């Protein structure tokens, strides 16, 4: 069996935490989902308004995809996961088109696995609740101040 993690490298190494903890399933191989695209940077370029269409999200030619997944054995059971299942499902389809015959999507994804604290994981990092509370408090103070200023401005009219 081989485990394929298609999340970003930052999610894989635990820097981008999207569950109680960050990290990855032991032994997983990280090949980010976006690497399937002709231009893996398309999503970021769209967000930065550097481009106006998603043509770069088209799949690479089959030969390029075969090279991308050459570390994997197409005859082994392949478990694919991501954060929630969407990226894994699409990657599973790509693998099947490439001739992988035993592809499964781990439905619980990292969201379920990462929140199961007794499940083994590598590169474990934890969500910093204290920092979040501090930032939320500061944000609430700013909202309160802005509401006060708005009320005062309306009173002057």
Predicted regions and their residues:
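Rhodanese-like catalytic fold shared by cysteine-dependent sulfurtransferases
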Residues: 1-2, 6-157
């Amino acid at each position: 069996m081989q485990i394929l993690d298609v999340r970003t490298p930052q999610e894989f190494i635990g820097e981008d935490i999207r569950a109680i903890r960050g990290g990855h399933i032991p032994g997983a191989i990280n090949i980010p989902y976006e690497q399937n695209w002709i231009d893996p940077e398309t999503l970021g370029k769209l967000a930065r308004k550097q481009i106006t269409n998603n043509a770069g999200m088209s799949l690479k030619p089959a030969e390029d995809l075969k090279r991308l997944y050459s570390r994997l054995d197409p005859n082994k059971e392949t478990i694919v996961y991501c954060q929630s299942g969407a990226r894994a499902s699409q990657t599973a389809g790509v693998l099947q088109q490439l001739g992988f015959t035993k592809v499964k999507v781990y439905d619980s994804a990292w969201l379920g696995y990462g929140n199961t604290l007794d499940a083994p994981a590598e590169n474990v990092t934890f969500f910093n609740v204290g920092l979040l509370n501090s930032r939320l408090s500061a944000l609430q103070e700013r909202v309160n101040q802005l509401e006060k200023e708005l009320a005062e401005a309306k009173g002057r009219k």
